[in-house]
Amino acid sequence: MKRITVLLVAAIAAIAVVAATQAGAASSGTAGLTNPKHFFWGAGQAPASDPTTSLQNDLIYHGGSGGPGAIGVQTKPAVYLVYWGTEWAQGFTTADSDGKLYSSKTLQNYVNSFVGNVGGSPYAGIQTQYCNGVLPGSTSCVGGTGFVTNPKRQLKGVWTDPTPVPSDIVALGLAENLVDDPIAMEAQRASGHFGYDPNATYVIITPPTEIATGQPVYCGYHTQTTSIDGLGNPFRLEYAFIPWQNTNWPGLGQGCGFHNVNAKSNSFGNGVFDSWSIVIGHEYAEAVTDPDNFVSFQDGWNDDQTSENGDKCAWINTQNIALGGHQFAVQPLWSNEAFDATGNGCVVSR
């Protein structure tokens, strides 16, 4: 998610104040630091495209040295899904554009199936060209070590946390500039629930609200909280926030991918839930290849405009891919290898 420092309107300015001290990890209770968010902007809100020369378009490795505990890339990616809120525990329905109702269980099955089958796929294989063992400024991993791998079954756990989502998220969508960031704190609770994994992304998903969190400014983000464990060792907790995607105001759903690929919905959720696989796929890919962000320094793979592998292909040629016997809407991901060979860096397989 490209970090935006030049803000578009005053409302976005309130959301973009992102460095804050907060409560620490659930395992230790010590203080932590929430680092700047990498936002995925809705269609039509993305920054201008990058220049077209090869050097300026390739992702560049930034050294993996962004503070204590930095890893550069996730070499063995893992994902934990957290459905946070009483609504998920109780169940609810959401309406498609034609009024047809879909259950929250159907949505959860769609998301779980996507994340549960992306590991080992050609789509996730795009990331295996990147590593953490090359010099800063490198645009390839020739001679590198610490490559991103593509294991199957990257979904390591699913948790429905029935505790209520705080009202400052539900009503305002400004949690990310509060002293005690509730999203980061929920990620820390998830780490306590599942166990800590430096190669994992903890994905926090909130239920529908009258005013969707953070929307219509952005569709999601990934970031990390830097904390201290019980032995005094610094560690990074990588997490992504996926607010409710299907709220229909003002044009929100289409802005984040509602029916972006599939005009008609089916019983599995294609169409009505297109946005969920597009946005989660975007955040997952960026968290794997550019996980560190210590005090605004992105030390993984991003280009000279700080755009990551998802940003560079956002809303370009979105399409279905087959995973686990189902179709899922996704955006392409950036491939240095493909760009250098063909001039087209936005691909859906490797």
Question: What residue spans do the PLM features occupy?
Answer:
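Loop/turn elements at helix/coil->beta-strand transitions in domains of secreted/extracellular proteins
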Residues: 75-80, 123, 197-202, 235-238, ...
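Active-site recognition of the HExxH zinc-binding catalytic motif
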Residues: 278-290
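N-terminal carbohydrate-binding/catalytic regions of secreted carbohydrate-active enzymes
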Residues: 27-174, 178, 182
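Metalloprotease/metallohydrolase-associated module, dominated by Zn2+-dependent proteases
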Residues: 217-274, 290-350
